Amino acid sequence: MCLSDKFFSTFVLSFAFLICLLPGTLYAAHGVSLDGTLKYPAGFDHFDYVEPVAKKGGLLTLHALGSFDKMNPFTLKGTEAFGLFGIENSLIFETLAVGSLDEPFAAYGLLAKDIELAEDKKSVLFTLNENARFSDGTPVTVEDVKFSLDTLKSDLAHPSYQMYYQDISEAKIEDKAQGKIRFLFSRPNRELHIIALQMPVLNKKFYTEHGFGSESTADPLLPPVGSGPYIVKEVN
């Protein structure tokens, strides 16, 4: 196809102008850290402190003080069951990235396989792992991620989430087919992209069907759908 010099010049200038309007990328990587250095390379199999050929199967009994009356750990009312989601025990729900116990202030992609921090540090773009699945077999999508942020920042969730994510102004789906979603920040903060990575991802279909928090009409002990390594088989 032939293009006139005039058209080609106009196209190049227009394209260059468009590029200037898009957020510049500070870096794109499989993980992030506050100082910009990572211990583990892209494609690493396991953390050094993990036994990669650990025996599978058997029975593990864990204990916790007190009782529980709900299976949703993200609401204020009630007491959730131990191990659903937490800093040390996230057996049911997963986050966009996971921290390394032998490396301070670093996180590696879990549900997200690629992390791109904008040059102005006012947004971060996540590309989801196409192999990520919930326990019901459905894929983890950008719609689930957006639903999670919107829900956790709403009055339906525990107030601590509103405070923690207050500087994340919006989750914007950029490419549904490619699994790309951008978190926009209200102000530059060197820790915000790490904070965003710590957000648990909820199953939109499950909580739309059964409700969330005060809007839920389901049994509070209904086993949840998560993407973590374990499922809740039954509640006694």
For the regions a language model picked out, list residue spans one by one:
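Solvent-exposed loop/turn segments at secondary-structure junctions
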Residues: 66-70, 131-133, 152-155, 188-191
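Surface-exposed binding/hinge segments that line
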Residues: 2, 127, 162-210, 229-234
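A short, structured loop/turn motif at beta-sheet edges
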Residues: 56, 118-121, 173-180
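Bacterial N-terminal signal peptides
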Residues: 11-24
